[in-house]
Every structure is written in C-alpha cells, then in structure tokens.
C-alpha cells in the first residue's frame, strides 16, 4: 500500500472557470489499486507555487508518490517540468519516456510533452499531461511499476533478480 498525492495544475481550474476532470480521473483510475489518495489540490500554473507544493508534500513524509496533471506542454505558462526539476534529487527518465512512446501511437502530439519524473526525499514525483484522455493512457503505462518503484525508493528492495528467474 502506498500513499498518493494529486496536484492538478491549471489556471482556469484553480480560478473555478473550468472543472478539473483530470485529478478526479486519476482518483477513479486508482480505485481498487494498492494505494490511498491522501492529498489533492488544484493550483495555478505558477512555477514557484508548484515547486513549493511539491517540496512540502514530498518533505512531509506522508506521500510515497505525487502525480501532477497539467502544465507539461509548450504553452508559455506550462512550467510544471521546470518546477519539478528544480526540486527533485534525481530524475527517473524512463517513466515519461514510456508515457510519450505509448501515447505516440494514439497521437503524434505526444512528442510535444515535456513531462518529467524524479525522486525527492523518498517520494516519487511524476508529471502527467493535462488532458483526461492522455492521463488515462499514461496511467495505464506507469501503474504496473509504481508499487515496485516505491519499494525500491524506500529501500525495501535491494536486489533485483535477473529476468526469467
């Protein structure tokens, strides 16, 4: 069982001008998984605020994983990757690489994603896209490895058996 936080990053949703559909979709998609959502926020596309929330949640020790949604594209206010990179201790490039690779079969626009993933103080942070459809696709890709990632980060797994045995 791992604890999860969800941060939706959207100017319009944070001002109440649009409903957040991606954050609730993440919650729904994880129902029945071996995790518990312990935090959920909607904040604007402000790099300093994003970095502060990520630091606060990761440093609290209450969350094993933080999933962000939104702010990973090319628009001028899309700053989630920069905010994430500014606070992580190490990158985990395989997660966003596989999300982009998998999503590319649905849309070539996946190449434009700048999502990143990394670890800060024992907490895995993963940027997801903002579109509900893209969120669902990316969650399907990363869900099978999240529990193992948490176990490795927490030091509960020290040896990895060779494939096939």
Residue map of PLM features:
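Non-catalytic beta/alpha edge segments that cap or flank active sites
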Residues: 1-165
